[in-house]
Regions:
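Non-transmembrane, aqueous-exposed alpha-helical and coiled segments at domain scale
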Residues: 1-424
Length: 424
């Protein structure tokens, strides 16, 4: 029997690594693109035919005509936001109804989930996690508590199910003493979104994806965020509520682990983080501001300033290990084109004075130990081959590959699809 392959594409830092552009570069090789976790709290920014799009729930392969895109069971879906996102794409001439399939087992983000998100965050006072306020955490909480609503529930007796869940949420919100909300308008748009979802293929995605594989077709699994936001392996409690690592593709799509082939890990040539939580290489000076300005480091969904810092190789090696990464893709290399000195963290000094190259249980308070590299001071944005790379940039890449024990196969030198160097 001819069997298709499953490859996984995921970020390796705290999210925002540039997955959208890379998916668009890689998708021509695949028949199906499937999103396996997360929700509208994370956005992939893509440029297609001169127009910029931010995809929050829809897989990035939607711009490749004729390819099936699947929203897997591991995703949490906000019907109103999904509808707005899909209609924006349809206005631009992208027909989604036949090419976008939605898992019956994907959980629904209710309007009251967003209110719960705000209420829980407000109750934490100074210990806020830095949630995006999209209702992601409360939705996954309901999922684990076995009280959630799923896409498959909209097909029969939905209003009754919805009202029961809403009443339970309102009790929780009242218990938290939170009164600053009115869901009337949001609820109206949300219900319109429910009717809109019914126009799509609502499928048993685990069966569909395995039938696709048995037919010999290839699947690219697309993750959101990054492993340092993984609920198990990230900088807990400053994490998201899902498994963002490679194993999440198996859980979030119903694929056996023996199906996984290549695991593409995406990293920036530096590092960023949005929201609260430890960030060992964070820069609080003019260098950090310069990286933010040159890299346009603002959240695709929230617009929040991203915290910027040097590349953290201790953290990256950990992410490569827990994901089984086979190839690296380095984004935004051009952002560092004008820096006289580039740094990379190669070890941590712990609070007891010892040094380690293993990511510790507690990241707060660790001190980065850097290796310095001479900057290349060359505009690489028009390069078409790795043969044009300056010696200083080659030295930086060579060191990263040696330290991380993983090849860097693709180097991005600008936002456009053409500004992508595939290395030999």
């Amino acid at each position: 029997m001819n069997k298709g392959k499953v490859d996984v594409l995921l970020g390796l830092q705290w999210g925002d690594e540039g997955k959208g552009k890379v998916v668009d570069v890689l998708t021509p090789k695949y028949d199906v693109i499937a999103r396996f976790q997360g929700g509208p709290n994370a956005g992939h920014t893509l440029e297609f035919e001169g127009q910029k799009y931010v995809l929050r729930s829809i897989p990035s392969g939607i711009f490749q005509g004729g390819k099936v895109n699947i929203i897997g069971n591991g995703v949490v879906l906000a019907p109103d936001l999904f509808m707005a996102e899909a209609k924006d794409l349809e206005k631009s001439g992208h027909d989604l109804k036949e090419r976008l399939h939605i898992s019956k087992k994907a959980h629904l983000i209710m309007p009251t989930h967003r209110v719960l998100d705000a209420a829980i965050e407000a109750s934490k006072g100074k210990n806020k996690v830095g949630t995006t306020g999209k209702g992601i955490g409360p939705t996954y909480t309901d999922k684990v508590s076995r009280t959630g609503l799923r896409v498959g529930d909209i097909l029969e007796n939905f209003q009754e199910k919805y009202e029961a869940h809403k009443a339970a949420h309102l009790k929780q919100i009242a218990a938290l003493g939170y009164t600053d909300f009115d869901i009337t308008e949001v609820e109206k748009a949300w219900m319109e979104g429910i009717e809109y979802i019914k126009q799509f293929h609502i499928v048993d995605s685990e069966h569909e994806i395995n039938k696709i594989l048995r037919s010999g077709k290839d699947v690219l699994c697309e993750g959101a965020q990054g492993p340092m936001l993984d609920v198990d392996f990230g900088s807990y409690p400053f994490v998201t509520s899902s498994n963002t690592i490679c194993a999440g593709a198996c859980i979030g799509l119903g694929i056996g682990p023996n199906r996984i082939g290549n695991v593409y890990g995406i990293m920036k040539a530096y590092c960023t983080r949005v929201g609260a939580g430890p960030f060992p290489t964070e820069l609080f000076d003019a260098t950090g501001n310069k990286i933010r300005d040159l890299g346009h480091e603002y959240g695709a969904v929230t617009g929040r300033e991203r915290r910027c810092g040097w590349c953290d190789l201790v953290q990256l090696k950990y992410s490569i290990m827990i994901n089984g990464v086979t190839e690296l893709i380095m984004m935004k290399s051009d952002v560092l084109d004008t820096f006289p000195t580039i740094k990379a963290c190669v070890a941590y000094k712990l609070q007891d004075g010892t040094q380690t190259t293993d990511l510790p249980y507690e990241l707060e308070g660790v001190e980065p130990i850097y290796k310095e590299f001479k900057g290349w001071n060359v505009d690489m944005t028009s390069f078409t081959s790795e043969d044009q790379f300056p010696a200083e940039f080659k030295a930086y890449i060579d060191f990263l590959e040696e330290y991380l024990e993983t090849p860097i196969r693709i180097v991005s030198i600008g936002p456009d699809r053409e500004q992508t160097i595939v290395r030999k």
